[in-house]
Amino acid sequence: MNMVAISQPAVTALVPGTFLDPLAIGIVLGGTALAVVLRNRLGDVGRALAALTTLWRRPFSADALLGQIAAQERIAHRHGLFSLDRAVIADPDMAAAIEAAVDGVSPEQVERLVCDRVTARAERHRAAIEVWTGAAEAAPAMGLIGTILGLVQMFASMQDPATIGAAMAVALLATLYGALVANLVAMPVASRLKRLARAEASERLRLAAPLAHLATLERARKREIAA
């Protein structure tokens, strides 16, 4: 009896190397980086890269600084506001406000100083966030450019079947890389930085009223001494 061999289709496994194409990577990453540099100031680009180190930090909390302000207030009650001039304050906003209070600035001006510094800090954060938002916008466009270049190369080499596959790979993978860079890297980074910046601005505004209150202590202390 004749045995008829039934051929089974070969199962092709997904090989990770098939999804790597140096030319497509260069077009997407290089084009995105160039677009970001051309659209933003170099200082903002540097801040955007430096902001990557803050992604996994906890959101800023003003509780520790409020405790320091309370301690400084007790010192000012006991020894006078001018004794705070020797205090070592690590936080720049708090240090600037205490220095202004020691110099005799009014409470309203101290509060305005804190709010202005919070606004300036938020503006710097916004510039860094816009760098990553711009990268998320540029990456898919660079992927489309890579796709067009790959298709042009493919149609130009129709007479050479050996090069058609490589050109088609560039065309398809460039689109894939652009989508991945935008949706798995740039946009998540921008969203995370935006949440951190919003939380920090809200927390730092809590410092304005206590720091402004420090500016009133010297007058109150003088009245107590006179009485």
Predicted regions and their residues:
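Transmembrane helix-loop junctions in multipass membrane proteins, especially transporters and channels
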Residues: 40-44, 158, 191, 195, ...
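Transmembrane alpha-helix interface motif
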Residues: 172-227
